[in-house]
């Protein structure tokens, strides 16, 4: 098995995992965050959120300066000490937010798909949808390489929409609350592998990895982890991995940050 004393990276989703889906509370996870920080174990946030949102949350959680994965892997925010790496401070995968928006506007105009993007509304509306403050809601609109939307059409039309996006080199991904469109080449798994390889190159040893997530869009991330915690979530589809060996994967009984704490307790408390 493994311990927090060895080279280790922890990758964590946010909403529904480290943060409560409704209140955004993270206090149940605070003791473990402190313990990992004291052991110099990087906790790498990985989410559909924008880098602007996540940098704010990093500071709140005491994780500032560490790398993070934003917009479902389309954006990698580099660690503060990685200034010599090409692309610092952020690496963008695939086409830009503006280019994706143009594609979506064309599809909506010509093929009459029904959806509302975050670009279609103001921060007050997003605050109503999410329960965030207006200042935090404004950060959700600062996309760099994806578009977030609410789907307002039928399941049949969604299948057609997804197929059209795939033809255009894009993917349609379900999050905890919203849907996301990003380049087909981007993903949480590719971003995580890049970060793991960078730590390995800098230290000379591949770190052991632990990932935590609660939704279907976390599955690619958890697949490439050495160990995985599937936090009990609200999504009816859940998370299904190809390798669910119980020595590698733990499914929690609790939701959100309490489940996050439960997962860390399972893998580390007895060690």
Curated annotation (Swiss-Prot):
Keyword Cytoplasm listed: yes
Keyword Ion transport among UniProt keywords: no
Catalytic site: 13
Record's catalysed reaction(s): 2-O-(alpha-D-mannosyl)-3-phosphoglycerate + H2O = (2R)-2-O-(alpha-D-mannosyl)-glycerate + phosphate
CDD domains per the UniProt record, alphabetical: HAD_Pase
Cofactor(s) required, per the database record: Mg(2+)
Entry-linked Pfam families: Hydrolase_3 (PF08282)
Gene Ontology terms describing biological process: mannosylglycerate biosynthetic process
EC number, UniProt record: 3.1.3.70
PANTHER family documented for this protein: HAD SUPERFAMILY HYDROLASE-LIKE, TYPE 3, PHOSPHOSERINE PHOSPHATASE
Family: Belongs to the HAD-like hydrolase superfamily. MPGP family.
Record protein name field: Mannosyl-3-phosphoglycerate phosphatase
